[in-house]
Amino acid sequence: MSVRQLFACLAVVALTGCAAFNQPSELEKKNVSELTTHMRTWALGRGLIDLPANWSGGGDVKLYYGLGADHSSVAVRVLGEGVTQERFDAALNERAHRIAAVKNDEMNDIPMLVSARRETPQSVMLQYYMRMTQRQTFVHELHLLVEDVYVMLRADSFKGNIAPVEARLLELSTEIFKVTAPQNAGAGFALGPIVIRSHHDQEIASFYFRPPASDVALNVYINALSPDEKERLHVRTQKDTQIFLAGDYENLRAGPITLADMQAEESLIGFSDDTHRQILFVSENYRDNPSLNRPAMGFRLSAGGKKRSAIDPSKPKDLVRWTLPSFASRGYERPLWQLPEPTEPVNPSLTDYEAMAVWDAILKSVRIRYGAVAPKPDPWFNPRGPTPEEAAESKRILDEFIASFEARKP
C-alpha cells in the first residue's frame, strides 16, 4: 500500500468515526421531540416566540417618552397572574406598611412613604422618597389589577415636579390590556399576559424563561432604537473568551443566521473547570434602520452551573418581596446561619445536541407580530368633529355659496 493510499484510508476512518460520534442517540432524539413538538407561543415585545411547553418566564420593560435630554420614562412589570382583589389589596397593604415603617433620618424621621392614594378599586398610587435625603426626589408607583393580572408602573420625579409624573402613570394605566392569545395581541408592546398600547418613542426590555427546577435558562434583551454593535458577535466572542476563559473553550458552532427576518449571528460555546461543564449560546441581530418593529434583540441560552430549586405549586407567589425598594426589604433578610448551604454546580442537563436542537427551534420561531406597531397619532388631528353650531354655520356658508352661483345664471 502506498503512502497516499494509507493517508486516504486513515482519512476515511477518521471521518467515519466523527460521523458516528456526532450521531444523536435515540434518547436524545426522543428528548428533542418532547421539547420541540408541542411548544407554547409567548408574546415577546413586538414579536412572538415559541418555547417548550413546560417553561415559564417573565420580564419588564422601560418606556421612554421623548428621545432628548428632557425625556421621561416609566418602568412596567407584571408581578403576578391569577391575582384576586383580596390578594391585590393585601399585597398593597403590606407594601405600604413596609415602606412607611422606614424613617427618613434626613427629614426628622418622617416616614419614607409620602402618600398612598386609591385611584379606583383596581388601582393605587404610592409615593415615597427615593432615598434618605432632604431632596424632593420621589418614586411613584401605580399598582393595577388588570382583570386578574397585577401590574406595577414605576417612575421617578425630581425637584418636587410631581404632577406630570403621576399624570403620565394614570394615562398609561388606561393603555394596558390583558391578552389571552399572544397571536392576537395586536398593536403594542406585549409583556407576558398584557399588551401596552402607549405611544412612546423607545422601549428597552428584558425577558427570562426557564424549565422548572433546572440549570437551563434563556434570557432575551430588546432595545428598539439601539444601534448595532460596532464589533460583530464573533469578534467579541474571541476577545471575551480569551479574557475570561484564557481561550480554553469548545467552539460548538458559530456564524451568520436569520433572526425574525433580520440578519444575525450566533456563537455557541462550551467550557469546563475542575468541577463541572457549562454551555453558553448567544445570538444577536443586525439592522440598518432601527425602529420599534425592527428592534435590537439579544438571546442567551445557558446550561450547567447553578441548578434552581423547585417551586412549590401550593405556595402562592410572593407579590411584594422582590420589588420592594432596598431600604424596605430588611425584614426579609435572614442571618447567615439560617441560609441554606450553597448547592454544588452541575453539568448541563441537556446534551450539546439537545441544547442546539432546542436553540434552533426557539430562534426559528421568533417573528414580529403583524400590525404590532400602530401609527403615531397626529397631534393636530381633531377627532371630535364639529359642534352642532359649527355644522349649522358651515351649512349656511355652503348654501350661500351655492345660491350665489344660482343668481348668476341668465
Which residues does each predicted region cover?
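Charge-rich interaction segments
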Residues: 187-231
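Signature of long, low-cysteine stretches enriched in small and polar/charged residues
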Residues: 97-144, 217-310
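C-terminal motif of bacterial Sec signal peptides marking the signal peptidase cleavage site
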Residues: 16-17
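Surface-exposed amphipathic alpha-helical segments
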Residues: 55, 153-195, 299-410
